[in-house]
Amino acid sequence: MKALLIRDLRLATRAGGGFGLALAFFLIVCTLVPFGVGPEGGTLSRIAPGILWVGALLSCLLSLDRIFALDFEDGSLDLLATAPLPLEGAVAIKALAHWLVTGLPLALSAPVFGLLLHLPGPAYPWLVASLLLGTPALSMLGAFGAAVTVGLRRGGLLLSLLVLPLYVPTLIFGAEAVRRGAAGADPMTALVFLAAITLATLALAPFAAAAALRVNLR
């Protein structure tokens, strides 16, 4: 399992799907928003929680199609399906690698991007906490979508259409936690729901993704 994780981390960085791409896209989103809505600090601070979460969500979406695509092309996916390690475990490892390359760097760098959007000071710890809780669900749901669309031509578009609706609950509670933190209210309720979504996703999505892979490998 450790060897598979290290291999996937190396592949992610070498194949152009590393954290640099996700961070660059996140920066572009946070930079362009003030041009669209105006530079007024009050307006930006009100919409900052939602914009930051949408930016993180879209940044995670960029490299989802690579989770299984390279292994499918070189035949490694067939070997994983017949390896002693259960396919569900391999799916979980690949989702973890995706999160380490995209979700974790986004969560840790989000306060810097929050400055660009005049995010209120009290919201910063809740921004990081919500992203640390929510982005694992994004990676795991993305792994499920990648498993369903692996091997399809132009599967990236279908992957986006499949995964984005599944991201909505995480987006709602993640942005709400940051919004409550910015207003000085208690964000714990939103964080509890966010954690519940992530735990449910981590428990169920590997089995769904493994089943989809077995169907596509027949």
UniProtKB/Swiss-Prot annotation:
BP GO terms, sorted: cytochrome c biosynthetic process; cytochrome complex assembly
CC terms in the record's Gene Ontology section: plasma membrane
GO molecular function: heme transmembrane transporter activity
Top-level taxonomic group: Bacteria
Keyword Aminoacyl-tRNA synthetase: no
Pfam families in the cross-refs: CcmB
Subcellular location per the Swiss-Prot or TrEMBL entry: Cell inner membrane
Transmembrane segments: 17-37, 50-70, 99-119, 126-146, 155-175, 190-210
Bilayer disposition of the protein: Multi-pass membrane protein
InterPro entries named in the record: Cyt_c_biogenesis_CcmB (IPR003544), Cyt_c_CcmB_bac (IPR026031)
Keywords: Cell inner membrane, Cell membrane, Cytochrome c-type biogenesis, Membrane, Transmembrane, Transmembrane helix, Transport
PANTHER family noted in UniProt: CYTOCHROME C BIOGENESIS B-RELATED, HEME EXPORTER PROTEIN B
UniProt record similarity statement: Belongs to the CcmB/CycW/HelB family.
Job description of the protein: Required for the export of heme to the periplasm for the biogenesis of c-type cytochromes.
Protein name as catalogued: Heme exporter protein B
